[in-house]
């Protein structure tokens, strides 16, 4: 299991999505939105979705 934003970046890049914002809070929010969209369209598995959200949650809290 991945434990950092690199996992999420690689996951998003598989679908040609690159997220960058100089404000980390905004960037995490944008990543969250993109992950939700990928999952809602059935492009990523439930496990990938959960893993990504746990990483984002930990990053937002810490």
Region spans (language model):
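N-terminal acidic leader/helix
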Residues: 1-25
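Short, charge-rich amphipathic interface segments used for partner binding and complex assembly
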Residues: 26-62
